[in-house]
């Protein structure tokens, strides 16, 4: 319900504004304005139809509806940003006129030109975004870890975060992620939260757990909760994650081998999750300690407890500009490498790769 409320607020705030400005820009002809009106009516109707009947509709139908509505939702954000820039330009003209005379004399043509520039620009941006999502790449970062790891002088980890398996991210893309992971020949794979998006049925019905079982890592596959694991069908998500072949770490401490510790924290959204201090009782702090924590809020806590490396996801680096700028105001480190005292952190947007040594790490 929370997701729906957020989406419908955006629908009811952005769509009327876009419609109003677009309608003004179009020529006063039925052949232009009627299709424009129908587009907005159909999109909003499709959105409500998909939400109301989401549990009754076949998966392929609801997936199609989500593709259409999600694409328009993202496009509407960029259209709105473009229109707001134009509003500022119009305001500056009112304060101190500076538009050339030819523009004033052809104001309707100018608005129509800007209309098509925004449409084509946002369309190109959406095509680029789709290509980026559907063609994931591996991010490699080098990190130095000071502690010795016994007889082990190398450890390769693949970290995947924020898969958001659901209506949009499905079986084909997960198979790409698995193939990318196996191509790195990792010692260990970690799935750092938000494995599912909202409903669990899409992962269940497509048997995506069978694809995740194909992840190859001699030290195992480890999974932690993200905030999306607490949205809708929580128990079903827990049962499904247990079928993936990985080890689910919910406030748990394991030693994949005797040379280092791996601590998987429950998500920050669960206010009753255990403190890191309590989880580390009995942990030999002379060995490397790696903590998986979906949301990057606990840097100070990790630093105080002697953690060597914190691995996080969640932020998507804002994902859509200008959100990355806002993320920098919200998080101490919204993306990439960060060091606080002796503790090092990496916040991933999707796919990351680590190789640890006595004196170094490759992430």
Each language-model region and where it sits:
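Short, glycine/charged-enriched secondary-structure capping and boundary segments
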Residues: 172-175, 203-207, 236-239, 277, ...
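Non-catalytic terminal accessory segments
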Residues: 1-134
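His/acidic metal-ligating clusters that form di-metal
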Residues: 180-188, 213-220, 244-325, 332-333, ...
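A short C-terminal boundary segment appended to hydrolase-like catalytic domains
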Residues: 16, 47, 302-303, 355
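Conserved small/polar residues in nucleotide/adenosyl-binding loops
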Residues: 352-361
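Extended active-site neighborhood of metal-dependent phosphoesterases/phosphodiesterases
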Residues: 128-130, 135, 139-145, 149, ...
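Membrane-embedded segments
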Residues: 134-137, 148-235
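Active-site metal-binding loops of divalent metal-dependent hydrolases
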Residues: 161-164, 193-195, 227-228, 252, ...
């Amino acid at each position: 319900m929370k997701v729906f409320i957020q989406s419908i607020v955006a629908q009811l705030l952005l769509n009327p504004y876009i419609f109003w400005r677009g309608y003004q820009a179009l020529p006063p002809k039925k052949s232009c304005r009627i299709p424009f009106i129908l587009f907005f009516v159909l999109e909003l109707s499709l959105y409500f139809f998909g939400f109301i009947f989401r549990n009754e509709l076949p998966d392929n139908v609801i997936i199609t509806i989500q593709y259409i509505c999600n694409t328009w939702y993202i496009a509407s954000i960029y259209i709105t940003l473009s229109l707001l820039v134009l509003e500022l330009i119009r305001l500056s003209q009112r304060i101190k006129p500076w538009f050339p005379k030819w523009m004033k004399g052809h104001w309707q043509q100018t608005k129509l030109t800007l209309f098509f520039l925004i449409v084509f620009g946002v369309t190109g941006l959406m095509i680029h975004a789709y290509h980026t999502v559907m063609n994931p790449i591996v991010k490699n970062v080098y990190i130095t870890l000071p502690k010795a790891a016994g007889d082990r002088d190398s450890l390769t980890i693949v970290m995947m975060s924020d898969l958001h398996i659901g209506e949009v991210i499905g079986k084909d893309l997960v198979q790409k992620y698995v193939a990318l992971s196996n191509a790195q020949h990792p010692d260990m794979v970690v799935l750092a939260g938000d494995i599912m998006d909202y409903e669990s049925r899409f992962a269940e019905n497509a048997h995506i757990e069978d694809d995740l079982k194909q992840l190859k890592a001699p030290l195992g596959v480890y999974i932690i909760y993200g905030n999306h694991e607490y949205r809708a069908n929580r128990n079903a998500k827990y049962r499904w994650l247990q079928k993936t072949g990985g080890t689910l770490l919910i406030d748990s401490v394991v030693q994949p081998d005797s040379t280092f510790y791996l601590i998987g924290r429950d998500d920050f959204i669960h206010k009753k999750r255990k403190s890191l201090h309590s989880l580390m009782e009995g942990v030999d702090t002379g060995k490397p300690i790696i903590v998986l924590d979906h949301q990057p809020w606990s840097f100070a806590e990790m630093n105080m407890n002697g953690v060597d490396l914190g691995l996080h996801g969640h932020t998507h680096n804002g994902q859509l500009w200008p959100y990355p700028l806002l993320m920098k105001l919200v998080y101490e480190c919204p993306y990439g490498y960060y060091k606080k005292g002796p503790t090092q952190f990496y916040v991933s947007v999707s796919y990351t790769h680590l190789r640890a040594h006595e004196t170094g790490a490759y992430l």
